[in-house]
Amino acid sequence: MGWKTLDDMDLAGKVVLVRVDVNVPMENGEVTDATRIEKIVPTVEDILKKGGKPVLLAHFGRPKGKVVDEMSLRLVLPALQNALPGTKVSFAADCVGPEPEQAVAAMLEGEVLLLENTRFHAGEEKNDPELAAAMAKLGQVYVNDAFSAAHRAHASTEGLARLLPSAAGRLMEAELKALEAALGHPERPVVAVVGGAKVSTKLDLLGNLVGRVDHLVIGGGMANTFLVAQGIEVGKSLAERDMADTAREILSKAKAAGCTIHLPLDVVVAREFKAGAANETVETAACPADAMILDAGPKTVAALSEVFASAKTLIWNGPLGAFEIEPFDAATNAAALQVAQLTKAGQLISVAGGGDTVAALNKAGAAEGFSYISTAGGAFLEWMEGKELPGVAALTV
């Protein structure tokens, strides 16, 4: 799959419409975590260096096609200005029509313009061709730097890309390269770690992975469903008993594809789910009837450590236990730190993504050691499921 990048585009003197993700958390009208804003800086700076005029398009929250003051991108302007010191950043109170047209016409070289929330228009989420055409009128080139919104065919992510010469921004480019290295043409053996609470939410993911990876590690509440499918009692643990047949199908599909599935060998159980709860480690088949499985045990971690050490590529989505509460974060922490160590030693390419996953790796202090951490959430999951992402497909040459 090929796509153009900023290096392929002549941007001098051109207005460049850049789709970015600045959907940041806010409290009392102030940005509490500016990570997503900071990540778009390399793209904006590169466009400025090439003599282009960056005009930023983004959504914020879910206003459902109406103007909602608390979801105005005007609130993000101070944090964006902080991320681009020395660059004048202006704001236009719409993303189409006379106001942005005048603001674009008034731009000087070296300035940046942020447009209002694209989702204030109902046509954005419907991928309305008229809205996309009105956006396209504002610029000469389109750059998509919002991989996190690439799984949605919206006017500003898909429709617009088909109307102007288009390229991937630096963040999008990094994400696509990392994902291509992990699942497109990976170095083998490939290990996928899939955790989280429910099999039902990750069915497509598991079905796609068993045909593409050499080892599939299943953790979290999801592992309990697979244990139940094998006739193992899990006490009061979270398990989707109605998914047992589906779990058995995944196991047989994996066997046919030559993919080894790894389930917990021992588990940490407790009678209550709270920090510091009295707990014990037991063999997987020996979970007491009145207890619940909250983490994988040390034998499991030791076995996984051998699997990781033999791997060349690793993809991670979802924790191995109830990582939010100590001591049930032990397996996730130990596994994450080992992956980070192998990656730093040059033995492993490691890519992780999904909200809980990023939180778990940060908590373990391991995130910095991974080759690539995707902040994309839904788009990362759909990519792992093998689905075409409209925002990426629209950039493909």
UniProtKB/Swiss-Prot annotation:
Alphabetical keyword list: ATP-binding, Cytoplasm, Glycolysis, Kinase, Nucleotide-binding, Transferase
Pfam families: PGK (PF00162)
Subcellular location, record wording: Cytoplasm
Gene Ontology terms: cellular component: cytosol
Record GO biological process: gluconeogenesis; glycolytic process
First-listed, main subcellular location of the protein, grouped into a coarse class: cytoplasm
Organism, as annotated: Cereibacter sphaeroides (strain ATCC 17023 / DSM 158 / JCM 6121 / CCUG 31486 / LMG 2827 / NBRC 12203 / NCIMB 8253 / ATH 2.4.1.) (Rhodobacter sphaeroides)
Coiled coil ranges: none
EC supergroup of this enzyme: transferase
Quaternary context: Monomer.
InterPro entries: Phosphoglycerate_kinase, Phosphoglycerate_kinase_CS, Phosphoglycerate_kinase_N, Phosphoglycerate_kinase_sf
Similarity comment text for this entry: Belongs to the phosphoglycerate kinase family.
Binding site for substrate: D21, V22, N23, R36, H59, F60, G61, R62, R119, R152
Name of the protein: Phosphoglycerate kinase
This protein's record includes keyword Transmembrane: no
Residues at which ATP binds: K202, E324, G354, G355, D356, T357
EC number(s) given by UniProt: 2.7.2.3
Pathway annotation from the record: Carbohydrate degradation; glycolysis; pyruvate from D-glyceraldehyde 3-phosphate: step 2/5
A molecular function GO annotation: ATP binding
Reactions it catalyzes: (2R)-3-phosphoglycerate + ATP = (2R)-3-phospho-glyceroyl phosphate + ADP
